[in-house]
């Protein structure tokens, strides 16, 4: 009630609403959004200090920014219907984005958790990952370990080691795998180096002709693909031949696995949807 016992009018109520300056006078949803922004910001700072999970740190900062934008729109929505409409559009767009990315993430996880390493194959492709100078990264080391186990279990099949030399690498990914596998007793005659590829599409495209020279039937053979689980969905998406693929996933530590699975869903949406639209 206003002085004199008069109830506040609509304009006066609007002015009162906009004067809710303190945190505890905000709507409950606004307080929750502000707390989430702070949590995501602190989480991002913490994750950025850990090796190998940089994407999760950046994603946390991105989520903090989204929360701040939604908070700002929520506060401004009290001023006019235009701001309220913009808030609704942002909320609907965010919900659609989350649902779409969640669907992609479920598909990536399901593809990555199929382990067929006990099944035989006619040939092998080991996909490269980063090299720190001449030392294999954690991801590449796990692929080398998986390749060693599979090649020792199937001693009569050839393998292409696929991966070029990127920035900051003193040797190609293929050569790093070759050196490690031969040091562990794998016959070098079985190993074929493919050192030109810079991405997964090139890995597959450049490796197949090398296997065909060894007698591999790309239209009827069974091809074992060794890479990390998060990578398997992309391999299946890019592979367009009737060759039966045998998935041999290399195991990462759980915290790296979670980071790479998150990153992969965004990368697939970027490569398969956004990039073709913007090209």
In which residue ranges do the predicted regions lie?
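Membrane-interface helix-boundary motifs at transmembrane edges
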Residues: 76-88
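A transmembrane-helix-recognition feature enriched in membrane-embedded lipid enzymes
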Residues: 258-277
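N-terminal amphipathic/basic-hydrophobic helices that include classical n-h-c signal peptides
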Residues: 1-18
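Membrane-embedded alpha-helical segments of integral membrane proteins
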Residues: 28-77
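Perimembrane helix-loop junctions in membrane proteins
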Residues: 78, 108-115, 274-278
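Internal/C-terminal transmembrane anchor helices
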Residues: 85-107
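Short juxtamembrane and helix-loop transition motifs at transmembrane-helix boundaries
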Residues: 20-26
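A structural signal for short, hydrophobic/glycine-enriched beta-strand patches
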Residues: 102-262
